[in-house]
A protein has these predicted regions:
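Glycine-rich, highly charged phosphate/nucleotide-binding loops
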Residues: 28, 95-101
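A generic structural signal for well-ordered alpha-helical segments
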Residues: 20-22, 60, 82-83, 107, ...
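Catalytic core of membrane glycerolipid acyltransferases/transacylases, capturing the structured
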Residues: 36-95
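Short, basic, glycine/proline-bearing loop/turn elements
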Residues: 16-17, 85-90, 117-121
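A transmembrane-helix-recognition feature enriched in membrane-embedded lipid enzymes
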Residues: 1-31, 50, 77-86
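Non-catalytic C-terminal accessory region of glycerolipid acyltransferases
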Residues: 1-8, 99-194
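Short amphipathic alpha-helix with an adjacent loop that forms part of the alpha/beta core around
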Residues: 33-35, 106
Length: 194
């Protein structure tokens, strides 16, 4: 079953979630001025806390946000409708998911912010990366926006998101692994600003 993205729903929900995050997590954002106009590939680290909503709220409710999410999250219809309406779309992490890649490319080219976790999973080590974010940035010639989310292992721990300066990888660089490593290095360099 296919579920739709509803920009109006996202614009309504994100500020409410931001308020809840401020109350329950002492949520704060550093570097919001670094968010570029137009489409970009947003690359946060993947943490135990609810990383996708933390990243989306950091971008604010005024910009269209899309998010690649593992297909397993779309198994329950009500939850699938909710996350799709908020901008998520499924990706099969086991193989080349052409539909997800086309959706991602189209989103960035349409001026939307695409959130993609370069580590692919919360269980990846700090140095492990996937190449998808690098490939999308090169193919769209869009800037990459590194983002660091503090790691918290318990409910109601203080949460901080640091948004780094955007950078655009060399479109001639075809070694996506090198770009992916650079993305991860830039993400974890933001840790010092917390």
């Amino acid at each position: 079953m296919k579920f739709k993205y509803h920009r109006w729903f996202q614009a309504l929900v994100v500020p409410l979630v931001a308020l809840a995050f401020h109350i329950f997590f002492g949520y704060r954002v550093i570097g919001r001025e670094n968010i570029p106009e137009g489409g970009c590939v947003v690359c946060p680290n993947h943490v135990q806390l609810p990383a996708p909503p933390f990243a989306a709220v950091a971008l604010g409710g005024k910009t269209p946000i899309r998010l690649m999410a593992k297909k397993e999250l779309f198994r329950k219809k009500i939850f699938a409708w909710l996350i799709a309406a908020l901008g998520a779309f499924p990706i099969d992490r086991e193989g080349a998911d052409i539909t997800a890649i086309k959706t991602a490319l189209g989103s960035v080219r349409a001026g939307q912010k695409l959130i993609i976790f370069p580590q692919g999973t919360r269980h990846a080590a700090e140095g492990e990366t996937k190449k998808g974010a690098a490939m999308l940035a090169v193919k769209t010639r869009a800037p990459i926006l590194p983002m660091y989310i503090t790691e918290g292992k318990r409910f109601r721990c203080r949460a901080t998101v640091v948004i780094g300066k955007p950078f655009t990888p060399d479109p001639k660089q075809k070694d996506y692994g090198l770009i992916a490593d650079d993305i991860l290095r830039r993400i974890y360099a933001l840790k010092e600003q917390v």
